[in-house]
Amino acid sequence: PCDLSISGDIYPAADGKMVFAANNKVYLLSADGTCQLLSTLKIGEQLMGEGLTLRSNTLYKDGQKVADGLRGCQAVQELSQGKYVALCDEQTKTNSHVAVLTEGTRTLAIAPDYRFCVSGQENTHHLISTIMDKKGNMLYSEPFYYLHDLTNGTLATAGNMAFDTNGNLYVSTPLGVQVADHNGRVRAILSLPAGAVHSLAFSGNYLYVRCGEKIFVRQMKAIGHNPKHGAMSYQSQG
């Protein structure tokens, strides 16, 4: 059985499943509730995604070192072809495999076409949008997505975010999962009886959400986009 005393975020995995860490162990969870123990984390090691861990400012993929010198990293997204984007305070060692974003806090999502990324911003209604060029440079960061908030502008994004293949952004917040369109406007809020959503993972057409030590799953018509499966175009919403 799964240990649901989860530390950190939940993350998408292959075949519509998700992974998470609890008490230094990494679990794989299916939509039908089947749970499998995958591995044990080392002391000081943090799960950052499927097969991704961070320890002593060093990023690992399936136990192999990817890059070091990543100080204050809060989120990592794996792209295709061995590339990564990391939200960190700074990068002290240049690495061609990892593009570092220093604007924003806590959470990171990559647009399906790889043209921009979105990061969290504390004590505001907004999320930050940053253009990514083909060389991995981060350009022109600015507040863009506007979230609903009942705390008078003191919202800190509760957990992580994900795009679907239509380019809509799903954000875990105290009000529930807020779904924003291409123009940065929230078009829907998926609320849960358990209250605030602390984290989410969009894997295939299954949307997983964590509320404290409870995990809910909903089968969606939309399909989550996992950045490591490659860039894809999507139709403009105007």
Feature annotation, model-predicted:
Residues 17-37, 59:
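Beta-propeller domains
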Residues 125-126, 130-132, 145-182:
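Loop/turn-rich, solvent-exposed surfaces of beta-rich toroidal or solenoidal domains
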Residues 130-137, 219-227:
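Short loop/turn segments immediately following beta-strands, especially the blade-tip
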Residues 21-23, 56-57, 88-90, 121-122, ...:
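Short loop/turn segments immediately following the C-termini of beta-strands
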Residues 32-34, 94, 124, 134, ...:
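Short coil turn/linker residues within repeat-based beta-strand modules
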Residues 3-21, 42-57, 68-89, 97-117, ...:
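Beta-rich, blade/repeat-based domains predominating
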Residues 26-28, 91-94, 125-128, 177-178, ...:
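Structural signal for beta-propeller blades
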Residues 1-2, 36-42, 65-68, 97-99, ...:
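Beta-propeller fold detector
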